[in-house]
C-alpha cells in the first residue's frame, strides 16, 4: 500500500522550498541500494519485511544477478516532519508546511559506471555519501565525493554496516568511536581539499547532525540529534547543548552529576558521553539478543517503551535483533530527518549553482530564472541521460527542470551540446508528447512539472543524443556539458553472425550510445564497428545490452583492444617543410612536447579555448613558464577543439596569414585526430608554425591547397621529433588481508604493474594496496587476482593517466612497441610499415 498519491506529490511540487533532490553515492558494495530500501519501505513502495534484501532500485535483471547497481534510478518519496520544533531547526532556508517531497536517485558504485553518477549528480542538489565502517573511505568514495563537490553539491554522510563492526569484529565502544571519528575525518579532509567559496564550509559534523550511523541490512540508523532529543525530554535540558556534548571529548561524571572535559576523576577513567549515552544501549541490545537472554530483552524493550508485533516476539538471534533495532531506531526516519534538515532545497541551491550550471551570461533572463528557481520564467530543463522504455527502441529523457514549467504538448527548443544562440545547428523545435514521474523501474503520468523537480519526458529521444538543454527562450544558452571523470579507453569490435542482420546492428549501436552516457560507438575505415567503454566490466554490460536488447541479433565480439595516444619525446631534429599540391605555398613547422601538468590542466578544463586569450596567456606565462607572445598566439587546441595539443603561431610579418588560418586549423584537427604512426589521436604535442610562404593570388591558396599541406607538415614534424606511444594506466586499489598479500604482488609484477603505497586499516586485518597497472595488461586481472589470493582480494581500478610505452621506438619494426604498432595498423587495414618522414617532407 503506497502511502501517498500522485496528486499529493504534484501539490508538493509547487512548493519548491519543500523539495529535496538528492543522490546516494558511495564506493562499490558499501550499501547504497540496501539503505535506499529502508526509505522505500517507509514510503510503502516495498514491504518492510523485504527491505534490505530487495534492492528495489536495482531494476534490471543483470543488476539483481550480479548484486551491483549499473544504472542510476530515480524514485520520489513523501516525507513529513511531524514536530514543529524540528522545522525550526532547518537552517537558512524557508519552508512551507511540514510535508516534504524527496526525489532520490540511487547511483552505481563501480568506477566503470561513474558517468552514471555524474548524470545523477547534475540533477540533484544534495548527496548522501555512504561509507562502510569497516573499510572506511576508499578510492571510489573519494572520486564520487570530488565529483559532487565539483558540481557544488552539499554532502551528508551515513556510516553504514555498523552491525558488522559489532557482530564480526566485536569491537569495544571506544574503538568504535575512534573508528567513526577517523572515517569522518578522512571525509572532511577530502571536502576541505575541494573548498568552494560560494558553497561555503560543507564539512560534516556528528554533533550538528550531518552524520548518521547505522546498518542498511538491518534497517536501523541514528543521528546524534535523535538521541539528544530523547535525553533532552528525559532530563529537561536544551537539545542543542545536549547534541554538542554527545560527541568529542565530553564526559558525564555520575558522582558529581556534572559534565567535564577531563577524562579521569579521582584516578578512575570516565566513560565518553557518546559511548555512555548512545553506544551503551545499542551494545546492550546486541548482547542481550545475540546471547539469547529473553528476559533481558523484554526488560530493555520495556525501558525503551517499544512495542513489537506478535510475530516479531517469537524470533530469535539476528532476526529478533533486526526487529528490535528497527523498532528502536528506524533508518528511514533518521535519514529523512537528516535530508530535510541539512540538504538544500532547489530554491537555496540554484542560487549558488547557477554559475556552474549555465554557460551564458549570469544576468540574462534564463540565468535569473535559474537563480530564483522561478516556475513562471522561461523553461530551462537539462536532460542528463536517456532511460530505455519497456517499448523497444524508445527512450525517456531523464532530467531536471531548473526554471519554468514543463507540460505535455509544450513546444520546446531542443538544444544539443554544440548549439550556439542565434545559429540553427544542433537545434530542433518540437512538442513534448508526455511528461512522467520516474518511480524506480516504473513511471507515473503527470500533467506538468514546475521548476526544481526531476522529470521524465517522452517523445524527444530522436532529437537528442545523450544530453542537452530544453528551453522556450530564444536567447537562452546551453546548460554546461557534464565533465566525466572516466574516459572510454577499452575497445572491442563487433560483427554480426548473419550478414542480413547488419542494419539491426547499426540501429542497435545508435540506441546503445544513447542509453549510456560514457560509451562511444564508431566505425573505422576497414568497416569494423567499434564499441569503447570505461573498463572491462562496463564494456561487458554494454555488449550484453547490445546483443539482447538494442540490436537483438547474435554477434561476434573481438578481444578487447586498448586506445593509445601518439606523442613526441623531443624537439623536431630539423624544421619540417611541406609544399602545397600546386607548389605555390610552403609551410614550415616544428613539433615539441608539452609539459604534463599543462596537458592535465587542459584535460581537466582549467585552460580552455573559450577563455579570454589575455587571461590564458597570463596563466601560461606565470604557471607554465611560456613566452607571453607565444601564449597569446595559440591558434587552436586539438583534436576536437579541446584536446591537449596546441598549434602556436610563431611567424613574424607574414602576408595573407589570417586568410589561411582556418585551413591550417582544419588540417591540425585532422592530423591530431589520427596521427602518422597508427592513426591514433595525438596528445601533449605543441606545434610551432615558423614561417609561411603564400601565393599572391587568393585562388591558388584555397582550402584544397592548404588543408592537406598542413596535415603533411604536421606529420613530418611529428616523425622528426622522436615519436612514441602513450598507453593508458589504471590506478588499482586492492583490499586484501595480510596473509594473501604475496599473491597480489606476484600478479601485479607479472603484469608490469608497480605498487606505490600500502597501508593497514586501523582496527582491521585488511591492507589497502595502491598500484599502477597498464590498461593493456588489465584484461582478466580480476580473475587472476582472485585465483592467486583464493578470492580474498577486492580490486577496484580507475583510469588515472597516460604513460610512455616502454620498449623501443614505434618506427623500428623489430622493437616491442614497433610490433604493437604493426598489429594496430594491420587491424585498421593500413600499410603495415609506418611511413618515413620523407613521405611528408618536401625539399626546397
From Swiss-Prot:
Gene Ontology CC: one annotated term: ribonucleoprotein complex
InterPro entries attached to this UniProt entry: EFG_II, EFG_III/V, EFG_V-like, EFTu-like_2, G_TR_CS, P-loop_NTPase, Ribosomal_Su5_D2-typ_SF, Ribsml_uS5_D2-typ_fold_subgr
Catalytic reaction list: GTP + H2O = GDP + phosphate + H(+)
Domain tr-type G, first and last residues per copy: 17-255
Modified positions (Phosphothreonine) in chain numbering: 57, 59
A GO BP annotation: translational elongation
Subcellular location field: Cytoplasm
EC class name: hydrolase
Amino-acid positions noted as binding GTP in the UniProt annotation, renumbered to this chain: 26-33, 160-163, 215-217
SUPFAM superfamilies: EF-G C-terminal domain-like, P-loop containing nucleoside triphosphate hydrolases, Ribosomal protein S5 domain 2-like, Translation proteins
Sites of Diphthamide modification: 700
EC number per UniProt: 3.6.5.-
Keywords of this entry: Cytoplasm, Elongation factor, GTP-binding, Hydrolase, Nucleotide-binding, Phosphoprotein, Protein biosynthesis
GO molecular function: GTP binding; GTPase activity; ribosome binding; translation elongation factor activity
Recorded family membership: Belongs to the TRAFAC class translation factor GTPase superfamily. Classic translation factor GTPase family. EF-G/EF-2 subfamily.
General function of this protein: Catalyzes the GTP-dependent ribosomal translocation step during translation elongation. During this step, the ribosome changes from the pre-translocational (PRE) to the post-translocational (POST) state as the newly formed A-site-bound peptidyl-tRNA and P-site-bound deacylated tRNA move to the P and E sites, respectively. Catalyzes the coordinated movement of the two tRNA molecules, the mRNA and conformational changes in the ribosome.
UniProt-recorded name of the protein: Elongation factor 2
Species whose genome carries this gene: Neurospora crassa (strain ATCC 24698 / 74-OR23-1A / CBS 708.71 / DSM 1257 / FGSC 987)
Amino acid at each position: 500500500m503506497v502511502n501517498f498519491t500522485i496528486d499529493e506529490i504534484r501539490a508538493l511540487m509547487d512548493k519548491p522550498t519543500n523539495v529535496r533532490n538528492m543522490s546516494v553515492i558511495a564506493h562499490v558494495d558499501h550499501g547504497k541500494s540496501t539503505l535506499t530500501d529502508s526509505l522505500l519501505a517507509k514510503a510503502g513502495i516495498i514491504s518492510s519485511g523485504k527491505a534490505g534484501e530487495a534492492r528495489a532500485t536495482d531494476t534490471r535483471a543483470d543488476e539483481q544477478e550480479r548484486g551491483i547497481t549499473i544504472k542510476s534510478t530515480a524514485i520520489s518519496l513523501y516525507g513529513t516532519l511531524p514536530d514543529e520544533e524540528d522545522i525550526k531547526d532547518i537552517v537558512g532556508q524557508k519552508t512551507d508546511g511540514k510535508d516534504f517531497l524527496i526525489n532520490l536517485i540511487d547511483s552505481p558504485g563501480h568506477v566503470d559506471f561513474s558517468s552514471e553518477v555524474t548524470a545523477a549528480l547534475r540533477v540533484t542538489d544534495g548527496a548522501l555519501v555512504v561509507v562502510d565502517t569497516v573499510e572506511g573511505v576508499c578510492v571510489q568514495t573519494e572520486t564520487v565525493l570530488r565529483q559532487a563537490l565539483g558540481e557544488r553539491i552539499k554532502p551528508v554522510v551515513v556510516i553504514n554496516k555498523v552491525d558488522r563492526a559489532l557482530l564480526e569484529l566485536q569491537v569495544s565502544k571506544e574503538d568504535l568511536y575512534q573508528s567513526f571519528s577517523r572515517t569522518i575525518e578522512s571525509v572532511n579532509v577530502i571536502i576541505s581539499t575541494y573548498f568552494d567559496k560560494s558553497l561555503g564550509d560543507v564539512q560534516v559534523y556528528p554533533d550538528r547532525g550531518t552524520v548518521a550511523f547505522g546498518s542498511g541490512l538491518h534497517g536501523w540508523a541514528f543521528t546524534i540529534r535523535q538521541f539528544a532529543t530523547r535525553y533532552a525530554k528525559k532530563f529537561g535540558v536544551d537539545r542543542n547543548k545536549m547534541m554538542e556534548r554527545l560527541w568529542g571529548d565530553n564526559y558525564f561524571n555520575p558522582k558529581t552529576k556534572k559534565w567535564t572535559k577531563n577524562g579521569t576523576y579521582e584516578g578512575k577513567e570516565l566513560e565518553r558521553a557518546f559511548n555512555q549515552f548512545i553506544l551503551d544501549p545499542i551494545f546492550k541490545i546486541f548482547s542481550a539478543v545475540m546471547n539469547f537472554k529473553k528476559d533481558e530483552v523484554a526488560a530493555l524493550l520495556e525501558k525503551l517503551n517499544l512495542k513489537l508485533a506478535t510475530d516479531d516476539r517469537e524470533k530469535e538471534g539476528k532476526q529478533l535483533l533486526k526487529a528490535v533495532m528497527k523498532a528502536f531506531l528506524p533508518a528511514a526516519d533518521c535519514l529523512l530527518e537528516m535530508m530535510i534538515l541539512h540538504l538544500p532545497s532547489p530554491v537555496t541551491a540554484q542560487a549558488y549553482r547557477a554559475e556552474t550550471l549555465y554557460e551564458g551570461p549570469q544576468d540574462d533572463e534564463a540565468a535569473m530564472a535559474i537563480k530564483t528557481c522561478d516556475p513562471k520564467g522561461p523553461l530551462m530543463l537539462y536532460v542528463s541521460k536517456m532511460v530505455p522504455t519497456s517499448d523497444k527502441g524508445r527512450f525517456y529523457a531523464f532530467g531536471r527542470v531548473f526554471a519554468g514549467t514543463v507540460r505535455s504538448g509544450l513546444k520546446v527548443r531542443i538544444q544539443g551540446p554544440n548549439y550556439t544562440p542565434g545559429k540553427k545547428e544542433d537545434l530542433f523545435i518540437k512538442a513534448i508528447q508526455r511528461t512522467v514521474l520516474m518511480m524506480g523501474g516504473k513511471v507515473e503520468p503527470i500533467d506538468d512539472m514546475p521548476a526544481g523537480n526531476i522529470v521524465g519526458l517522452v517523445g524527444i529521444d530522436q532529437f537528442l543524443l545523450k544530453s542537452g538543454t530544453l528551453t522556450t527562450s530564444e536567447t537562452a544558452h546551453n546548460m554546461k556539458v557534464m565533465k566525466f571523470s572516466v574516459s572510454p579507453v577499452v575497445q572491442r569490435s563487433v560483427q554480426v553472425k548473419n550478414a542480413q542482420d547488419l542494419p539491426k546492428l547499426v540501429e542497435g549501436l545508435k540506441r546503445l550510445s544513447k542509453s549510456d552516457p560514457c560509451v562511444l560507438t564508431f566505425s573505422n575505415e576497414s568497416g569494423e564497428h567499434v564499441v569503447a567503454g570505461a573498463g572491462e566490466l562496463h564494456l561487458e554490460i554494454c555488449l550484453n545490452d547490445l546483443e539482447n536488447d538494442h540490436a537483438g541479433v547474435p554477434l561476434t565480439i573481438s578481444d578487447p583492444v586498448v586506445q593509445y595516444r601518439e606523442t613526441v619525446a623531443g624537439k623536431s631534429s630539423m624544421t619540417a617543410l611541406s609544399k602545397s599540391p600546386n607548389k605555390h605555398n610552403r609551410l614550415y613547422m616544428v613539433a615539441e612536447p608539452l609539459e604534463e601538468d599543462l596537458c592535465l590542466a587542459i584535460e581537466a578544463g582549467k585552460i580552455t579555448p573559450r577563455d579570454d586569450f589575455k587571461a590564458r596567456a597570463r596563466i601560461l606565462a606565470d604557471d607554465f613558464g611560456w613566452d607571453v607572445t607565444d601564449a597569446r598566439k595559440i591558434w587552436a587546441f586539438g583534436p576536437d577543439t579541446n584536446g591537449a595539443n596546441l598549434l602556436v603561431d610563431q611567424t613574424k610579418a607574414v602576408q595573407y596569414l589570417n586568410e589561411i588560418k582556418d585551413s591550417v586549423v582544419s588540417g591540425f584537427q585532422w592530423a591530431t585526430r589520427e596521427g602518422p604512426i597508427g592513426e591514433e589521436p595525438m596528445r601533449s604535442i605543441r606545434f610551432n608554425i615558423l614561417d609561411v610562404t603564400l601565393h599572391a593570388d587568393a585562388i591558388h591558396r584555397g582550402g584544397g591547397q592548404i588543408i592537406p599541406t598542413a596535415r603533411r607538415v604536421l606529420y613530418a614534424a611529428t616523425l622528426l621529433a622522436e615519436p612514441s606511444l602513450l598507453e593508458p594506466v589504471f590506478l588499482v586499489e586492492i583490499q586484501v588481508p595480510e596473509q594473501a598479500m604475496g599473491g597480489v604482488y606476484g600478479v601485479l609484477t607479472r603484469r608490469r604493474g608497480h605498487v606505490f603505497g600500502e597501508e593497514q586499516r586501523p582496527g582491521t586485518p585488511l591492507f589497502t594496496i595502491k598500484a599502477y597497472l597498464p590498461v593493456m595488461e588489465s584484461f582478466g586481472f580480476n580473475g587472476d587476482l582472485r585465483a592467486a589470493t583464493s578470492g580474498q582480494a577486492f580490486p577496484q581500478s580507475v583510469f588515472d593517466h597516460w604513460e610512455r610505452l616502454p620498449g623501443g621506438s614505434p618506427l623500428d619494426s623489430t622493437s616491442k612497441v614497433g610490433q604493437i604498432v604493426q598489429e594496430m595498423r594491420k587491424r585498421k587495414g593500413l600499410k603495415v610499415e609506418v611511413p618515413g618522414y620523407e613521405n611528408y617532407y618536401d625539399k626546397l
